[in-house]
Regions:
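Conserved N-lobe ATP-binding subsite of Hanks-type protein kinase domains
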Residues: 32
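Conserved N-lobe beta3->alphaC-helix segment of eukaryotic protein kinase catalytic domains
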Residues: 44, 49-75
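A short, aromatic-enriched beta-strand patch in the conserved N-lobe beta-sheet
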Residues: 84-85
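Activation segment signature within eukaryotic-like protein kinase domains
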Residues: 122-123
Length: 409
């Protein structure tokens, strides 16, 4: 682990007045990320702004503390750097490096699916990062395209460590993203680094196929059932080595899942799918990148969605509004509403309850006039009970739909 770089005067206390705030780069569950220029040096950063009232209301303070404590102590080529934090009466601020190539999510959306060599390149950098974190006893727990950024040189950087946690053995916190969630999390049997390698297998499948392996048109229940059954249909055009690797990652039995065995990440790195990879060169960023963003300057935001810097109440809502590309009632391309177009999370609602709150954005779940705004879920025995709350594309309240189904015995 390399020493953490210092960006600001150690003696100086940062405040909002030190920065000239720019455009919004993204919206989150209780805040937004904005481009900002540090007045003393003119350098640009990404500042995550979180409304304190919303953070407390959603019981996310511990997640924020955990993210800060983890990021302040690590430095790695494929992890976004956090350079400082500060706060005022209403808001918590976290200062990150500005990664100007945009989200990996956007690349997948535009390319639909990736050639084997390109997918292998990105999978290499992700595998190195997960291995690095696991060696520090850190489980990431939220791997998905939306949490991967592309830097100016075309390399990946993992961001958003809100669900990351230092784990010695297992943890039982209910968290993750439905399409990427491991079966042991759904069953609430405790999970460890193996959950990250499951998500890695899901992401590799999505890169190569253009959709997640457990996608179900019916929404969450169908996805969870497919995950628990563990049945994956691989497209015929995916090479055999990739299929073999994914079949060893998407294994429900933790004692047989690659990445969670005696050799750890070594089983993955030694797999034939990665035969052409020099891992030391990859770690030093010496492998030729498949795509370099066309960046005009360090403050270029052209690879990010455009957001209106509207009323401040937007920063306090539970979920962000639909991006422009997804607000049409009748989409030109139905694939725009596949699960990988969404930003969905499961959050534990309290320290003692087994209930979860699932936030789903950018997703219509086959309902052209409604999108899922929030879903409160509770696991009791083998039953998963959901109360789904929908809103219209223009933000008006929609129907509430209670459902209870048996997921497992």
């Amino acid at each position: 682990m390399s020493p953490k770089a210092r960006e600001f005067d150690e003696e100086a206390e940062l405040c909002l007045g030190d920065f000239e705030m720019g455009v919004t780069l993204g919206l989150g569950s209780f805040g937004r990320v904005r481009l900002a220029r540090y007045r003393r040096t003119g350098k640009h950063y990404a500042i995550k702004m979180m409304n304190k009232a919303a953070v407390l209301q959603m019981k996310q303070l511990e997640h924020i503390r955990s993210e800060k404590n983890i990021l302040v102590q690590i430095a790695y080529p494929f992890v976004v750097n956090m350079f400082g934090t500060f706060q005022d009466e209403t808001t918590i601020y976290m200062v990150f490096e500005f990664v100007c190539g945009g989200e990996f999510f956007t690349l997948l959306r535009n390319e639909d699916k990736l050639p084997n060599d390109q997918a292998r390149f990105y999978a290499t950098e992700i595998a190195l990062t997960l291995s690095f974190l696991h060696n520090l006893k850190i489980v990431y727990r939220d791997l998905k395209p939306e949490n991967l950024l592309i830097d100016k040189d075309g390399h990946l950087k993992i961001t958003d460590f809100g669900f990351a946690k230092e784990v010695e053995d297992r943890t039982w916190t209910l968290c993750g993203t439905p399409d990427y969630i491991a079966p042991e999390i759904i069953r609430n049997k405790g999970h460890n680094k193996g959950a990250d390698w499951w998500a890695f297998g899901v992401l590799l499948f999505e890169m190569l196929a253009g959709y997640p392996p457990f996608y179900d048109e019916s929404g969450g229940f169908g996805t969870y059932k497919k995950i628990l059954k563990g049945m994956v249909e691989y497209p015929e055009d995916i090479q055999a080595e990739a299929v073999d690797l994914m079949s060893k990652l998407l294994v429900a039995d933790l004692t047989k899942r690659f990445g969670n065995l005696h050799k750890g990440a070594g089983d993955i790195m030694d797999h034939p799918f990665f035969d052409t990879v020099d891992w030391n060169m990859a770690r030093r960023k010496e492998i030729v990148v498949p795509m370099i963003p066309d960046i005009e300057g360090e403050n270029d935001t052209s690879y990010f969605e455009e957001y209106d810097d509207e009323d401040e109440h937007v920063e306090q809502v539970c979920t962000p509004p639909l991006p422009r590309a997804y607000t049409a009632l009748q989409p030109a391309d139905p694939r725009a509403f596949a699960p990988r177009r969404s930003q969905r999370r499961i959050r534990k609602s309290s320290a003692t309850s087994e209930s979860m709150v699932l936030f789903s954005t950018n997703s219509r779940l086959g309902m052209p006039r409604w999108r899922l705004e929030m879903c409160v879920a509770a696991i009791i025995g083998g039953n998963l009970s959901l109360l789904s709350i929908y809103i219209t594309a223009d933000g008006r309240p929609g129907p509430a739909r209670p459902e209870t189904r048996m997921l497992f015995n």
